[in-house]
Amino acid sequence: MSAQRFEYKVVYADLRGRVSVEGDETLIEEGERMTAFGRRYLNSLGVQGWELAGIQHQPMGAAFHVFKRPLAEGQQPEPAKPIKTEPKP
């Protein structure tokens, strides 16, 4: 029997109501409370099997949230998205 393996997702969140994961942003809806926004976002990750594993606080109230979920035997983690760069003229 092999040891349990995990994949990880790093989520950046700030006090303006913005969540960013590898360039994909989710914004707070007009009139939505911050706590409701946080719960909505966390529940969407929970449905996908992600569990909060840690938080790294940043200046100005921002933070990196690290989530993990188990990998099935033989499954590989999702690859990270490449950084989009503009072609140089």
Language model features: what each stretch is:
Residues 1-89:
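Terminus-proximal functional modules
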